[in-house]
């Protein structure tokens, strides 16, 4: 927090910049230059989003933590003034509400229904299964022709197979589900197409929950079916929860696998250290540093003030939206004074990043993502020690049109 004189927010500045800001294509790992400028010069400011409204943009790590843990900051997307990502996201929040978009106590009540499978103990017990999936996919890479698209061959299949098994979703339906998910998260999806995809996804999951009512398995959707029968939630609620877990459970992890591998390939000395080390702490800290450095969920955390809140010498009034660019907080020199713009797998406080958000809405699957990344990076580099980029960095198609950063393809060879 800063010691500036307390001021109240009046009308938004006429020169509020457009949001989201564009990345510099020559620096694909970096936050947009405009975001870095706000962090350095105006850490609490306004920006203009798609509907013409001007929510607050909070860039400093300390301010983000303070607000994301403040009960006066609401995640209720139905509140007037909530800064939705797009018109389609606004529609989705109203048509298919999820517990992730609710406040306590309702958020906590629903979250507790799905927490058990994501506890550290449960996830650690899944390591052998995740290792087996990873080895099978790398076997396929080694047996096939080169170059290989790492996204298609490894980065996407690992988290998709894992989350499908956890949810009880048939893996053979993955293409249908992935197409719908893509339509919902692309910034440039034609208005209405995301809505159609969301409806199709919700109907699919609602029907699947219906089948679980009479034929339960050892999976999350079956657990939700029990709650439906008990009258704790509706079948639509269960479908909405499943939809959120399905999307969040694979998209960001798939992007991290591919983009993190690319970042290591661009830092060969650090890659070699990760590959050759027998110390498990090395891969653990490498994953934390990659999460900090890349911050896949670059523009997903939005909130609204439920009451007037003073922070950093500014009053954010009730009903005003707040945008949290996590990539700015994770490059904040106040927390990371030593070259935050560089990858450093030995960074001592890397784990203090906000890549999974913060507060009661922190990512439910954070432990799962960490374990998947640890297994995939270490196994890939150990089994293919000469892994290399097949082409040049400027040929890689980056996901600049999505709310989650990543690459569409990553051709590799060895």
Swiss-Prot record:
Keywords: Antibiotic biosynthesis, Heme, Iron, Metal-binding, Monooxygenase, Oxidoreductase. One of its GO terms (biological process) is antibiotic biosynthetic process. Its EC number is 1.14.-.-. Pathway: Antibiotic biosynthesis. Residues 1-32 are annotated as: Disordered. Changing residue 300 to A: 93% epoxidation, 13% hydroxylation activity on FD-892. Disruption phenotype: No longer produces the 16-membered macrolide antibiotics FD-891 or FD-892 and instead makes 25-O-methyl-FD-892. Double gfsF-gfsG deletions make a diastereomeric mxiture of 25-oxo-FD-892. Pfam families: p450. InterPro entries: Cyt_P450, Cyt_P450_B, Cyt_P450_CS, Cyt_P450_sf. The keyword Disulfide bond does not apply. Its cofactor is heme b. Changing residue 300 to V: Full epoxidation activity, no hydroxylation activity on FD-892. Heme b binds at residues 75, 107, 111, 303, 361, 363. GO terms for molecular function: heme binding; iron ion binding; monooxygenase activity; oxidoreductase activity, acting on paired donors, with incorporation or reduction of molecular oxygen. PANTHER family: CYTOCHROME P450 YJIB-RELATED, P450, PUTATIVE (EUROFUNG)-RELATED. The macrolide antibiotics FD-891 and FD-892 induce morphological changes of human promyelocytic leukemia (HL-60) cells and have cytocidal activity against tumor cell lines in vitro. FD-891 produced by Streptomyces sp. MAFF 225003 and MAFF 225006 inhibits growth of rice and alfalfa seedlings and may cause russet scab in potatoes. Involved in the synthesis of the 16-membered macrolide antibiotics FD-891 and FD-892. Consecutively catalyzes epoxidation of C8-C9 and then hydroxylation at C10 to convert 25-O-methyl-FD-892 to FD-891. Consecutively catalyzes epoxidation of C8-C9 and then hydroxylation at C10 to convert 8,9-epoxy-FD-892 to 25-O-demethyl-FD-891 as well as converting 25-oxo-FD-892 to 8,9-epoxy-25-oxo-FD-892 and 8,9-epoxy-10-hydroxy-25-oxo-FD-892. In vitro is furnished with P.putida putidaredoxin and putidaredoxin reductase to provide the required two-electron reduction. Monomer. Belongs to the cytochrome P450 family. This is Cytochrome P450 GfsF. It comes from Streptomyces halstedii. The lineage of its organism: Bacteria, Bacillati, Actinomycetota, Actinomycetes, Kitasatosporales.
């Amino acid at each position: 927090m800063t010691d500036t004189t307390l001021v109240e927010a009046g009308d938004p500045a006429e020169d509020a910049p457009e949001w989201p800001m564009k990345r510099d294509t020559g620096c694909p790992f970096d936050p947009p230059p405009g975001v870095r400028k706000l962090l350095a010069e105006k850490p609490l400011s306004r920006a203009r989003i798609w509907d013409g409204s001007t929510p607050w943009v909070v860039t400093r790590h300390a301010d983000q933590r303070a607000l994301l843990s403040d009960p006066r900051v609401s995640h209720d997307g139905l509140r007037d003034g909530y800064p939705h990502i797009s018109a389609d996201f606004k529609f989705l929040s109203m048509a298919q509400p999820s517990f992730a978009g609710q406040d306590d106590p309702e958020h906590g009540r629903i979250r507790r229904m799905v927490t058990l499978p994501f506890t550290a103990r449960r996830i650690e017990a899944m390591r052998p299964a995740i290792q087996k999936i990873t080895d099978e996919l790398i076997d396929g890479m080694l047996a096939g022709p080169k170059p290989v698209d790492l996204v298609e061959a490894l980065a996407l299949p690992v988290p998709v197979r894992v989350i499908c098994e956890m949810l009880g979703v048939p893996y053979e339906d993955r293409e249908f589900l992935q197409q719908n998910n893509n339509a919902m998260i692309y910034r440039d999806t034609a208005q209405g197409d995301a809505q159609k995809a969301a409806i199709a996804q919700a109907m699919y999951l609602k029907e699947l929950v219906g089948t679980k009512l009479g034929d339960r398995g050892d999976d999350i959707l079956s657990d939700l079916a029990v709650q439906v029968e008990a009258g704790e939630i509706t079948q639509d609620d269960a479908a909405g929860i499943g939809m959120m877990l399905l999307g969040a459970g694979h998209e960001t992890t798939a992007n991290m696998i591919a983009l993190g591998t690319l970042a290591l390939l661009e830092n060969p000395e650090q890659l070699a250290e990760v590959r050759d080390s027998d110390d498990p702490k090395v891969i653990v800290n490498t994953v934390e540093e990659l999460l900090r450095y890349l911050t896949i969920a670059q523009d997903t955390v939005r909130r609204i003030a439920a009451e007037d809140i003073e922070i950093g010498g500014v009053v954010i009034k009730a009903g005003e939206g707040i945008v949290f660019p996590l990539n700015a907080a994770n490059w904040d020199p106040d927390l990371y004074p030593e070259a935050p713009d560089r990858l450093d797998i030995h960074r001592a406080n890397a784990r203090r990043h906000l890549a999974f958000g913060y507060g009661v809405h922190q990512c439910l699957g954070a432990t799962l993502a960490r374990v998947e990344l640890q297994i995939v990076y270490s196994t890939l580099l150990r089994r293919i020690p000469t892994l290399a980029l097949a082409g040049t960095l400027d040929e890689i198609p980056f996901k600049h049109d999505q709310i989650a950063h990543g690459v569409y393809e990553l051709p590799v060879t060895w």
